[in-house]
Amino acid sequence: MLRMDTVHRDKGQVVILKKTNYLPYLVNLFIPKLFYPEKIVVARLYINVNKHDKHAAENFKGTETPCFDVPPSLFSDKVPMDKIVFLPTVMLPMGFEAGGVFGPGVLTRRSYPIDLKAAGHKGQTPPLFVGLRMDIQAPTRVKSLLKEVRESQPAQDILMNWVRASNNLINGEQPKEQELRDEFSLSMVFNLPTPPSPPSPYPYGRIPLQFNIYTPDLSNVLLLMSHQRDLTVAILSTVNNPHVPSVAFAAMGDEEECPKFELPLSAFPTFEGVNRPMFLPKRFMPKGFEAGCVLKPGALSDRWFMDNIGRFGPTQPQHNGSITPPLFVGKICREEPTVDMIRNIQLEIEKKASEDATLPAVKPKIDISITKGFMVMETAAEDPKPPKGAYSVQSYEEAFDDGCVVKVAKKVATEATDTRGRDEIRTSCDQPQEKDEGSAEADKKHLSCFHVDSDIDNIAMAMARMGVADISLPAEGEAMPGIDGDRALIQLSHVLEDRNQIRSHTDQLMQDHIFRMNRNRMLALRQPFTCIGCGTQENK
């Protein structure tokens, strides 16, 4: 669909309908309902959908149809403007005061709009509709509410702009247009801001469309109206007011009563079957209403919207724009005092702004520390510089605070071979001197820590310089429940000693996997596969 500005049409500009080779009925053609004063819309038609109406061609041939001057700048090449067929008013889409069609094959490929032509299209060019929108004059209330609203603004800014624009109505300015109807008044739906829902793991899920029943929860909805009648109608949005199954169960159940009333036959048609109005329980209705019902999407015809509120109703986002939007019809409660909704919205915005301005900074309740170390190593006093890839610490407490769980120290070798003598030496000599030598030994040793992601080659080389190293877990068994400390140390020693064999074995496994994938792919394509090792060819 293309749009263009600066097109003017006189009200009495008409033409005699002579050529009726292709005259489609485009009342059901859906084009987004937006306020486009004096703008042209160009839309592609489909022959199998927008078929030629023979009866309309016979009836309207020779009659006057509204027309306008189609600007040549719409097309990239010369176009036979005399071959456009202007449609009667009753055959135009809703919201257009004039429009015509170029039949199939009338426009050349060079003159047909590129954006509307399908890629790789063959055959004659499809028909094209060129229409002029009505010069829509919205009510003063709608203009004042929508004056400063922009799509790019966040929801909070839109809310404030609506209230700021509505202050003129509070000061006594009333709309000068005549009432649309005496049976009901037209309202604008305003949804109060709700707390954001947690993000869904499936953000692009398919949105279910409800065609059989539509029961939204309108308890958090305000209806703004310029004048008050016993009944009011408002266009709902399937996006902002989605179908709620719990409301449907409550409306069709026997647990609570749904207040009902009769819709005036002078304003509404007779509803039957699935199109009948669904009356809501009072707890799901907006404030200030004693009864209310909802008409599902598609229950009312386009003609009804056109004759009643179609061109004056505020636009609402819909999941399906090819059918008419849902409608709320409510009966105002006269017994309750009148609620100044605009004032309530202003107070809510001021309260929200004051809360945001005085909101203190939230500090984390738990200090989540990031593990820095993995292994603490004692190095000799002769080499105070930490090994490659490690950093120095002052004490074991500092190393354990950094997250070290493995302790490596140089193992002192003894010449005694008798186990009993070794035990006697350990029990008789080592234990009494442990406390005395502890402080002196700590002064002679330097502590270094390795990160969890340190290079394993650097760790192994540092341990190799120590000679015979003793690996231990300083943490007790209660501090590591469910962990076999001895087995973990054996596995760590195996990884440090046989790291090259582990790497070569892993590399061989990857090469074997690549070989099998290539072999299976070639055999699946029925191509001979040559084995690299033996040189033989395999055929499937």
UniProtKB/Swiss-Prot annotation:
Coiled-coil stretches are none
| UniProt keywords, alphabetically | Repeat
Instruction: Enumerate the residue ranges of region (Disordered).
Output: 416-443
UniProt feature, compositional bias: Basic and acidic residues? 417-443
Q: Which domain of life is it from?
A: Eukaryota
User: Could you say which residues form the signal peptide?
Assistant: none
To which protein family does this belong?
Belongs to the DM7 family.
- Protein name per UniProt: DM7 family protein GM11956
The species is Drosophila sechellia
